[in-house]
């Protein structure tokens, strides 16, 4: 995904984050090949190994993100593990503190998607675009990921949404969720 998105938009900067080093090594190789093929300098994307739970620690308070892509993340289906989801309200509020734009979320997992439809409003987002069959929506511009291609060939429908911060959500409720999120993060470190 990043090897398609970043060279197509050289005016934007990208950060690819994953907790697995193997994924980032593969992404880096694909980035280098894509930029070499297009004879572009690889100067608008960085790869970083880290736990996304600590994303806010990677940026200054004044740094802002225009868009966050969450593509085919671990669905953590077991009840006690759901709080590890990248779309759990505790995590979404972390993103919200850095975000001036949108979150684009894609998955093949029905349960994760349906529960995420509830998570986003809980974390102070409003869903502006949503489909349970992305490939039947020709008006949506996106780059297909390898997982997406694989799942599509298996006949699985790709679910997709775009969410943005909801300005009508009181800051106090976001602060409470953020405090809970930070308290949990400190215990896990």
What positions do the PLM features span?
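SAM/dcSAM-binding transferase cores
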Residues: 128-189
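Conserved short alpha-helix immediately C-terminal to the canonical SAM/SAH-binding motif I
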Residues: 23, 112
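Conserved Class I S-adenosyl-L-methionine
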Residues: 90-93, 114-135
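A short SAM/SAH-binding and catalytic strip from SAM-dependent methyltransferases
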Residues: 53, 59-86
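A short glycine-rich, Lys/Arg-flanked "PGG" loop and its adjoining helix->strand segment in the class I
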Residues: 85-104
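S-adenosyl-L-methionine
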Residues: 28-67
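Conserved SAM-binding loop of SAM-dependent methyltransferases across substrates and taxa
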Residues: 1-11
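Conserved SAM/SAH-binding beta-strand->alpha-helix loop
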Residues: 20
């Amino acid at each position: 995904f990043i090897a398609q998105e970043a060279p197509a938009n050289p005016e934007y900067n990208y950060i690819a984050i994953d907790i697995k080093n193997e994924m980032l090594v593969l992404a880096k190789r694909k980035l280098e090949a894509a930029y070499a093929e297009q004879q572009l300098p690889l100067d608008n994307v960085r790869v970083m190994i880290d736990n996304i739970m600590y994303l806010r620690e990677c940026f200054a308070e004044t740094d802002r993100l225009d868009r966050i892509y969450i593509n085919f993340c671990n669905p953590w289906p077991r009840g006690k593990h759901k709080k590890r989801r990248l779309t759990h309200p505790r995590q979404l509020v972390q993103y919200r503190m850095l975000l001036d734009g949108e979150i684009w979320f894609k998955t093949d997992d029905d349960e994760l998607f349906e529960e995420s439809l509830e998570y986003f409003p809980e974390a102070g987002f409003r869903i502006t675009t949503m489909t349970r069959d992305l490939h039947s929506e020709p008006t949506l511009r996106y780059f297909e990921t390898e997982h997406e291609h694989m799942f599509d060939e298996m006949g699985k429908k790709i679910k997709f949404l775009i969410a943005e911060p909801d300005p009508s959500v009181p800051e106090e409720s976001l602060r409470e969720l953020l405090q809970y999120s930070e308290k949990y993060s400190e215990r896990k470190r």
